[in-house]
Design a protein with these regions (language model features):
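A conserved alpha-helical element in kinase catalytic cores
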Residues: 52-109, 120, 125-142
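A cross-family kinase active-site recognition segment
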Residues: 123-181, 200-203, 316
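All-alpha amphipathic helical-bundle segments outside canonical DNA-binding/catalytic cores
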Residues: 274-288
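Active-site acidic catalytic loop and adjacent metal/ATP-binding pocket
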Residues: 35-54, 85, 189-242, 252
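A glycine-centered beta->alpha junction motif in the catalytic cores
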Residues: 109-126, 144, 162-172, 290-311
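Active-site activation/catalytic loop segments of kinase-like enzymes and analogous catalytic loops
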Residues: 239-272, 289-307
Length: 337
């Protein structure tokens, strides 16, 4: 695996690694072919049996990633975050013969690789069973947990800034981006990744990229729900983790019943991002606007790359930016998040 390695070869090597670690060389192999779970520039994920191997982006801050992986393994996060796997020191005896038809294990790579147990994901074909309340309880528990050691900042605002930069590069001079940029410029500097959040809101343990794709049941298929993907986790404003469902609700993409179940469960579990009762929007307003911009910016960039018009959900988020750009944001010192 090299820095310029193709996506296909990354998938090949990850599948080989996951397969090699899924059972010993002496065990008769009845495994299905490795399954690609995700293949994007920021991460390639391949499963073989009970093992999931993930190649992170080549430009990943390895020190920060190490801290985030250690966080997922910390006992304080048991039952909240899916813990990583530690590869066996000697997964196969040194004199073992290669198994016929299997690829050789990968060579060291400039892309950091982590190993995880497989968990059963949310079923996208059954929206009525979507675990919004369970996700909210996990978030509340995460936010209430004292960081066990010094962590990097939560990467949510930085990801929003990258999405806007990607949109600008994909559509230079295109008037379609103007409402998104107007909404972006109206945000405070911290929400654009240009500084820390207000001090009273800055020290909470956050996931950084909450959506239903970040939940799995482990052990599969019926274990408890756990949060996965700590690539963006860190210290920050916990309201950011509620911002995507809040933005979807505001745009009409999330049913009011699902939003109420999510918010009520978070409050009942003692989540600190919003008051225990009353209006949650003073705390959610800025993060929800930022996630609206991020989603719209990524949609416009993808549409440009794929030479297509936005689909209905994408168009709703773009229209939300145009609507938000005409409204005064709630940016008082009392509600600076």
């Amino acid at each position: 695996m090299t820095a310029t390695q193709t996506s296909a070869s990354v998938v090949h090597d990850l599948g080989a690694l996951a397969h090699r670690l899924s059972h010993s060389a002496r065990t008769r192999c009845v495994c299905e072919p490795p399954q690609v779970l995700a293949d994007r520039p920021d991460g390639t994920v391949v499963r073989s049996g009970a093992i999931v191997a993930k190649a992170h982006a080549a430009d990943t801050d390895r020190e920060a990633l190490a801290a985030r992986i250690a966080l997922a393994a910390a006992p304080q996060l048991t039952g909240i975050l899916l813990p990583p796997l530690t590869a066996p020191e000697h997964p196969e005896p040194s004199d073992a013969s290669p198994r016929p038809g299997l690829p050789e294990p990968p060579t060291p790579t400039p892309r950091p690789v982590t190993l995880w147990p497989f968990g059963a994901p949310v079923d996208p074909t059954d929206p009525e069973a979507a675990p919004w309340a369970e996700a909210a309880v996990l978030l509340a528990r995460l936010h209430r947990t004292r960081p066990p050691f010094r962590l990097p900042p939560m990467r949510g605002p930085a990801k929003a800034a990258r999405a806007v930069a990607r949109m600008r590069a994909a559509r230079p001079g295109d008037p379609a981006v103007l409402p998104v940029l107007a909404c972006w410029r109206a945000l405070p500097a911290w929400a654009r990744g240009e500084g820390p959040p207000p001090a009273p809101r800055a020290g909470y343990l956050c996931h950084g990229d909450l959506h239903l794709g970040q939940l799995v049941r482990h052990p599969a298929p019926d274990g408890p729900w756990l949060l996965i993907d700590v690539d963006d986790a860190g210290a920050g404003d916990p309201a950011w983790d509620l911002a995507r469902p809040a933005a979807w609700y505001a745009a009409g993409l999330l049913d009011p019943e699902d939003w109420s179940a999510f918010l009520d469960a978070y409050r009942s579990a003692g989540g600190p991002a919003v008051p225990a009762d009353g209006n949650p929007w003073p705390e959610l307003d800025v993060p929800a606007r930022a996630l609206t911009v991020q989603t719209a910016a990524l949609a416009l960039a993808k549409c440009a790359a794929e030479k297509r018009d936005p689909d209905e959900p994408e168009q709703l988020m773009i229209e939300s930016c145009a609507r938000i750009a005409t409204l005064p944001p709630e940016l008082t010192t009392d509600h600076a998040s």
